[in-house]
């Protein structure tokens, strides 16, 4: 996601990661609303087999410059190369519809600007993958949904997602994804057969 324009340029002091106030609020919006748009950026059951603690994909609602366990990265760049600055939201997978994904990501960032959200401190030095659930709670670090079912319900309850996509598309996606999740829950996989049939 690139922010452009005189007010949105990312060119503050290095202490601020060269993020303007507007950029920080945009990033705060991404972090706040990521759980609500996860059903769009990660739309299938198997998407959540990638979004697991200790995996390569980030699930923790935090940000940093080089910490691979955070949801958003703000890679460094040379002071004279402001155009190279960017925010990297690292959770979307290739199955996402790019039009819907960009719509909800932009809406989340713009909501952060409109709500004047304060950006949390970056998490540079901690390997969040190594923290227990209790540690995460104590530090106030939330996570993305753990399943498609959880993601769909957060999406269904989101006023921002409904306003962004419109009632018709929002309701259709909720119904379709709930049906997909219900089908999956009733399916007995080969792994379950191999694991449990012999001990019954």
Which sequence ranges carry the predicted segments?
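Single conserved hydrophobic/aromatic residue that forms the stacking wall/gate
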Residues: 1-10
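Catalytic-core signal marking the mid-to-C-terminal active-site face
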Residues: 12-200
């Amino acid at each position: 996601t690139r922010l452009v324009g005189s007010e949105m340029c990312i060119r503050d002091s290095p202490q601020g990661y060269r993020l303007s106030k507007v950029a920080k609020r945009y990033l705060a919006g991404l972090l706040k609303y990521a759980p609500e748009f996860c059903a769009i950026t990660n739309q299938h059951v198997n998407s959540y087999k990638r979004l697991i603690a200790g995996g390569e994909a980030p699930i923790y609602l935090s940000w940093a410059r080089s910490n691979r366990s955070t949801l958003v990265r703000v890679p460094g760049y040379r002071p004279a190369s402001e155009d190279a600055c960017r925010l990297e939201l690292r959770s979307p997978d290739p199955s996402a519809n790019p039009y819907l994904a960009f719509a909800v990501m932009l809406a989340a960032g713009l909501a952060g600007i409109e709500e004047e959200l304060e950006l949390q401190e970056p998490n540079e030095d901690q390997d969040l993958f190594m923290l227990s659930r209790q540690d995460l709670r104590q530090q106030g670090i939330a996570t993305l949904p753990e399943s498609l079912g959880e993601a769909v319900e957060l999406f269904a309850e989101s006023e921002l997602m409904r306003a962004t996509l419109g009632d018709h598309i929002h309701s259709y996606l909720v119904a379709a994804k709930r049906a997909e999740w219900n089908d999956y829950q009733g399916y007995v996989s080969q792994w379950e057969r191999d694991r449990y049939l012999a001990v019954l």
